[in-house]
Amino acid sequence: MAPCMLLLLLAAALAPTQTRAGPHSLRYFHTAVSRPGLGKPRFISVGYVDDTEFVRFDSDAENPRYEPRARWMEQVEPEYWERNTQIAKDNEQSSRVDLRTLLRYYNQSAGGSHTIQRMYGCDVGSDGRLLRGYEQVAYDGCDYIALNEDLKTWTAADMAALITKHKWEQAGAAERRRAYLEGACVEWLSRHLKNGNATLLRTDSPKAHVTHHSRPEDKVTLRCWALGFYPADITLTWQLNGEELTQDMELVETRPAGDGTFQKWASVVVPLGKEQYYTCHVYHQGLPKPLTLRWEPPPSAVSNTVIIAVLVVLGAAIVTGAVVAFVMMRRRNTGGKGGDYALAPGSQTSDLSLPDCKVMVHDPHSLA
């Protein structure tokens, strides 16, 4: 095969769920996986409106059916589920044939596991009109065949895919796919956006922070996190004194958080002690303006010790001052004689031992 250009079909299919005028997309992801010795291939079909999964079919389910994955899909009539369940089962059967066919095209043995991925759908603008339609097929993670932007022709990735291309051209496959993309796909997307507008047209702004990670050779990694945002489109950049560090930055793909929002991070390696010269910038449509963040070091142990010592000294000074003030007040009240009590006439101080007196701290909550 030609050099593999891994399609991000599964990554997109795993993506889950502001108010947005557009564009919007309706996409379906089909995955068929052979598993020799473990039974028939598994077939999964997942549908997305923008970044929200709304339907799913899994051939491994106890009762394989097209099932809603979003609450707003409960408004769809029962016939929708019956019709699409049958379509999914037909696609499951076709995928088994396709897996066997590609084994033959690539002269592969039947002993290994192989995967076919298919993604198709449409994008519409804020006016509801079609912006583009697409269909892509991958085999074992590599491009196989794709519908071109004109929606009339196909691009084959290798010699094996050319066989499929010729068959599809003879069968008029592009014309049928174009009719669907320009018609039913756009119509259903409009309907889904209307039914699910509370979810699909919302915006959740990202919560961002920077973490600090030690490295050898007097280096550290600064990692800028953006969490809990929707929709998935976001930009994270690092700057050094105002200049972007695109080449030196590690950036991960946007990932689903599992709660209908997304997360992402970008990191740079910087010299130890120079962290404050680096800033992270977060751009998202849910933010009134971009965020700018720096690494904020926690208070040092020395600073904490000094603060505690100062508080102890101040506390001791306050207590000492209160005691001195109390004694001075008592002296004034007794005319400076040094005490409140005089010995009774005839008392013999030498005959009595002093009691074992202990200071009792008064409990302000006690009634005694």
Curated annotation (Swiss-Prot):
List the residue ranges of the region (Connecting peptide): 296-305
One cellular component term (GO) for this entry is: lumenal side of endoplasmic reticulum membrane
Q: Report the InterPro entries cross-referenced here.
A: Ig-like_dom (IPR007110), Ig-like_dom_sf (IPR036179), Ig-like_fold (IPR013783), Ig/MHC_CS (IPR003006), Ig_C1-set (IPR003597), MHC_class-I_related (IPR050208), MHC_I-like_Ag-recog (IPR011161), MHC_I-like_Ag-recog_sf (IPR037055)
Biological processes, Gene Ontology terms = antigen processing and presentation of endogenous peptide antigen via MHC class I via ER pathway, TAP-dependent; antigen processing and presentation of exogenous peptide antigen via MHC class I; defense response to bacterium; inner ear development; negative regulation of neuron projection development; positive regulation of T cell mediated cytotoxicity; T cell mediated cytotoxicity
Predominant cellular place of this UniProt entry's protein: membrane
Which GO-annotated molecular functions does the record name?
peptide antigen binding
**Keyword match Transmembrane helix:** yes
- Which segments sit on the Cytoplasmic face? 330-368
Enumerate the spans annotated as Ig-like C1-type domain. Answer: 206-292
Tell me the first and last residues of the signal peptide: 1-21
Residue spans, topological domain Extracellular: 22-305
Region described as Alpha-3: spans on this chain:
204-295
Report the membrane topology from the UniProt record. Answer: Single-pass type I membrane protein
The ranges of region (Alpha-2) come to 112-203
Ordered alphabetically, the record's keywords are: Disulfide bond, Glycoprotein, Immunity, Membrane, MHC I, Phosphoprotein, Signal, Transmembrane, Transmembrane helix
Q: Which residues carry this modification: Phosphoserine?
A: S350, S353
Q: Can the keyword Signal be found in this entry's annotation? A: yes
Where it sits in the cell: the answer is: Membrane
Function per UniProt: Involved in the presentation of foreign antigens to the immune system.
Q: How does it assemble?
A: Heterodimer of an alpha chain and a beta chain (beta-2-microglobulin).
Q: What name goes with this protein?
A: H-2 class I histocompatibility antigen, K-W28 alpha chain
Organism, as annotated = Mus musculus
